[in-house]
């Protein structure tokens, strides 16, 4: 059995994908799997899946075609087994606006959205790309002028109320919530790209020191999101806890697996090591 770890790609999250892919590949090889890495770029986004010999495609791709369902569609056409969510779940959850609409339709509370800028009822607001991850292109705007400038910088912006509260994230593995982690940024008000991936950018408190009721509710909602969207393998849902109310922000169908990523920390709450998560993922998608 051969496992090809696909990483890289052409999205703005390429560097994180490479780091995640290297960590996963190292774990697989350490555990005795016949695994090798394949780095994707603009020239081989389809051919790499056709030309390589593998029984399982371990996808460690963040953003762009690696997370929006397109590569999953290629693998479906080829009849290849691959890790993670399928075409539909990947495509929908990559679009933050559609994700919010569906979440709201099943009774999950989210921050209020505006479009266009003229509709904003109060400031500050958060403006972010509708289809980027890793908090890329995230703006905190305190007035209309700042909002208009932020919107100009983004191809497809989404505008939301900025809710002050505790930033939480919940990992789900094969439908079961791993636990709740609180993110405490050390430098910036926002949990942006640098806070996520720079050493010392943030502190991860796990399990999150919040009321038991909120902890259980976050776990329940994350599992519901995983199920409602038809997600498979690993997902990670982000929330803001403000005055006892949980607000769902977004769900990630292909969360980072670097040494500073959130899923490895969350996995320890269930007694899983990084290697355990990788092994469970392989076993799940080879069935």
UniProtKB/Swiss-Prot annotation:
Organism: Fusobacterium nucleatum subsp. nucleatum (strain ATCC 25586 / DSM 15643 / BCRC 10681 / CIP 101130 / JCM 8532 / KCTC 2640 / LMG 13131 / VPI 4355)
Family note: Belongs to the D-alanine--D-alanine ligase family.
GO CC term (a single one): cytoplasm
Task performed by this protein: Cell wall formation.
Note on how the cofactor is bound: Binds 2 magnesium or manganese ions per subunit.
Lineage: Bacteria, Fusobacteriati, Fusobacteriota, Fusobacteriia, Fusobacteriales
Keyword set, alphabetical order: ATP-binding, Cell shape, Cell wall biogenesis/degradation, Cytoplasm, Ligase, Magnesium, Manganese, Metal-binding, Nucleotide-binding, Peptidoglycan synthesis
Pathway membership, UniProt: Cell wall biogenesis; peptidoglycan biosynthesis
GO molecular function, one term: ATP binding
Xref: Gene3D superfamilies: 3.40.50.20, ATP-grasp fold, A domain (3.30.1490.20), ATP-grasp fold, B domain (3.30.470.20)
Residues at which Mg(2+) 2 binds: 250, 252
Name of this protein: D-alanine--D-alanine ligase
Residues noted as binding ATP in the record, renumbered to the chain: 124-169
